[in-house]
């Protein structure tokens, strides 16, 4: 039951798929492609296919069908097999010449029964049977044009993308984000005949939209499969309203009943709502090179996390604009090289300065092994120095092949260090530190006043100034740090000034980024009038107010702000740090805000008896494995902090940090201001 179980679980799932793909055309959706990318890489899939790269295709309605000499197909999908997904399957198969079709879904058959509105009692009677999959197999044969052709539908839990031995994210759930009070109003409007919910604290599974409930059930299905792989029975805990819903669903997940009875190991699974601490999500204090790389380099198309690393300088192709797409980009996902894997682990677990030195050390060692004419230089590591080492590999094909993964990480480091956004990162950090001190000395109105001069229109801005998206990041930081703020006249006046300035800036933008298009509802800057900007900005500030009050439901974890005194400056104390410290508190009292979710009558009786007898309630530190799942995203620096903290507080305890996504600061404005949290797109 080691933390390496994350990678082993993901790879075991993909091995089941790889066993099916020989001589096949393989169609993958984006989430499964991303899981493959981080688990074993597309090269491993190509080896198993034993065909050219054109045999790998994106699963979409316009996808190219199989030709006359391509009788086999494998579809690898992250969604339930229903609606648009099935329509796309039919469309591709009907214009192909397939005689053998395999459909792999990351969603269990039990969840497919839920998706098809089969009552729980009827679903329990179908244990061991798979009628939904069997019906689709019949349809596949019908679409292929011959009932004697071969069709197979199976479930493989391909929901994790492992970044490291202690860290993984879930590509298919990248848009899952905790609810805000405005979502409660929407839920009340959608169910006028039912009891009104007065706050987020009253939200349970019965109150959610069918889409969100099914989305959660898909995640729970995957987590149950992970626990089965690890051989553990899980105790579920929650910090926050949406985490409570997810933890309750996992604790009572009916298909896991038999697994839990026979499991020999034990684990604590603690879910935490990201909205309880957005300071860590948008802050720039992590001092981690990987976070900076992911924030400044362009995103790899179709991926939520990996980036494009320009590798043209290692080729003879001239660096002109028309050649930009000639050379395939590099990326961060670790290759099979031992040195690249070692460097990737070092980058994840080191501070920025140490990480850059590790890049230099690995490049020097690789060059030495290849007998390249390296000139050693000590002292401060510069982008130019790293580039000079990388250039040594340029005309040596064998050396390039041997160290391709390492060189991609090296180039990513150089391009990040030279990127103008990296200098801005330090400016953000300086402002955030100033803000923490200001909160102790002045009011919220005073803090917002400091932001006002930074709000500039596109015609006034220089490259050092903040664009609208970056202003949103700072606003989230400002409202998340202090917690609930009292609206007095001063704050109301300054808020109005900030809103007015921001609305003017938005309406004067010459071009709208994809995020600003979503926030404003306008596809082009021409359509964005001042009144539309004002409506969008009012919505943003409503969400900011709700963020400020997110910890009101907490009794213990009410603050992430530590005021300064005569000896210490004011500081930020991450909520995740507080949660882990409370879990491993040597006093081991019942945690106030870390709720245990009962799984059936036995647990309920224990909880009831504990009120008047000496029956100990389950505690999250009881077990040798802690799985911490952050709903809404986690940063690389936070994952490292959790890992190090657990090792220091309770040596020998294994910890896995899982999340819906790896965060960079710009993700949060999108999840807050431009995502329909109640109606996730499940593909049907």
UniProtKB/Swiss-Prot annotation:
The keyword Chloroplast does not apply. SUPFAM superfamilies: Sec1/munc18-like (SM) proteins. One of its GO terms (biological process) is protein transport. The keyword Membrane does not apply. May be involved in protein transport. It comes from Mus musculus (Mouse). InterPro entries: Sec1-like (IPR001619), Sec1-like_dom2 (IPR027482), Sec1-like_sf (IPR036045). This is Sec1 family domain-containing protein 2. Belongs to the STXBP/unc-18/SEC1 family. Keywords: Protein transport, Transport. Pfam families: Sec1 (PF00995). Coiled coil: none annotated. PANTHER family: VESICLE PROTEIN SORTING-ASSOCIATED (PTHR11679).
